[in-house]
Amino acid sequence: MQYYFGSKTGLIDALLERRMEELNRRRYELLDDVDPEHPARALRRIAEAMVLPFAEHLSVEGGSSYLRFVAQVTFSADRSVFEMMRGRHDSAVRRIADLVQQLSRDRRPDLVRHRLAVVTNLVLFTIGEREKLRMSGRRTGVARIGTAEFIEDLVAMIVDVLEPHGA
């Protein structure tokens, strides 16, 4: 298998690539109606664009495995998922960063990027961890929370982190 993909990195890239175009497209759909003139609604929609494309994979065949894989790669690979996807299916993520910066004019751009990196890691880790626990049959931690409530709570946490207050 490594020969076919050229290397372990090539294999990881191919597996990530498999769904990233779809995730990017879905994020754009969710961002279409973001209106910076209505900051609270805009931040909510941005948070949904960060969570829902991944959360929707919870009900897709093989989606749970993919989510656990992305979480594992994010926290154990030599390169971050961000580096692996830079310039490939990440334009919606750049759009999210632009929108959040627009809504957080008083916050320095490096702090906006930091917050976005933290919430992205939160999304990937939390969904991956929930799926790992769920697939192992353990109903502890986040695996005890129903899917809809889990997603809603994750979106709410992201809104809280990205809100401009306290900038």
Q: What annotation goes with each model-predicted range?
A:
Residues 14, 28-66, 116:
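Hydrophobic alpha-helical connector segments
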Residues 18, 69-73, 118, 122:
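Short acidic/histidine-centered micro-motifs embedded in hydrophobic/aromatic stretches
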Residues 5-28, 32:
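An amphipathic alpha-helix adjacent to DNA-recognition modules
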Residues 87-167:
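C-terminal peripheral helix-coil segments that are non-catalytic and often amphipathic
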